Design a protein with these regions (language model features):
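Structural detector of well-ordered beta-strand residues that form the stable sheet scaffold
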Residues: 82-84, 122, 182-185
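Histidine-centered catalytic micro-motifs
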Residues: 4, 121-128, 164
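A short, conserved beta-to-alpha structural element at the edge of catalytic cores
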Residues: 78-100
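Generic enzyme active-site microenvironment
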Residues: 58-59, 122
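C-terminal active-site subregion of NodB/CE4 polysaccharide deacetylases
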Residues: 1-58, 64-67, 133-225
Length: 225
């Protein structure tokens, strides 16, 4: 799980990875016979019994640096990824982060560029809010309106949804399923919640090099069992 690909120097959250560190991390995958792909591609491959050697790569929040900084590195390594975007904030910034530096978000042109390069465009909701705190109508808006908006923009209904802040419960997962998505990405889903609408992910940071990547991969695989 990635977020912004840029200079991480002033990021208090540790969610920014420099392009050269992303390059190192993808080289680490390649050296072990692993290829980064979108979540939709990974799930289809697993369903067909051919998921071996594939790793799902996701980029949350839809930062504008994805097209300029992440895409060239992904292409260099023959990888694809899923970009989770916020249709209600296109061309805006990460206003939900009170302490971090303001970072621009993708606009419509950026999304089309990413999609044309083979990136899976998926929904992160409309505005990056904790969905578990919303009433029924607001939750439906975040899930259904964001899907309709992205469908119109890309000409293709998004298959995936990513829960802002990674927070999900049974009600939210059910709303995502009802909206027509094929899967939902969390971080560490609560106990008792599993399946395609509560997919666990592992955060990758600037600090992650060979030893840490190995430990995180083992931890992630163990957690999926």
């Amino acid at each position: 799980m990635y977020h912004s690909v840029a200079d991480p120097a002033h990021d208090p959250y540790g969610i920014t990875v420099a392009p050269d560190r992303l390059d190192l991390q993808l080289r680490w995958l390649a050296a072990r016979g692993l290829t980064g792909v979108s979540v939709a591609t990974l799930l289809r491959a697993r369903a067909e019994g051919r998921g071996r050697g594939l790793v799902g790569l996701t980029f949350d929040d839809g930062y504008a640096d994805f097209a300029a900084a992440a895409l060239p590195v992904l292409r260099r390594h023959g990888c694809t990824a899923t970009l989770f975007v916020l249709p209600g904030r296109l061309g805006g910034d990460n206003a939900w982060d009170p302490d971090g530096p303001r970072r621009p978000l993708v606009d419509e042109a950026d999304i089309r560029t990413a999609a044309a390069a083979g990136t899976e465009i998926a929904s992160h909701g409309l505005y990056h809010v904790d969905l578990t705190r919303l009433d029924g109508q607001a939750l439906r808006d975040e899930t259904t309106r964001s899907r309709a908006w992205l469908s119109e923009l890309t000409g293709r209904a998004p298959e995936g949804f990513c829960y802002p802040y990674g927070t999900v419960d049974g009600r939210v997962a059910a709303a995502v399923r009802a909206a027509g998505y094929a899967y939902g990405c969390a971080i560490r889903p609560p106990a008792g919640l599993g399946g395609p609408y509560a997919l666990a992910r592992t955060h990758i940071s600037q600090a992650d090099r060979s030893a840490r990547l190995w430990a995180k991969r083992i931890g992630h695989r163990t957690g999926l069992r």
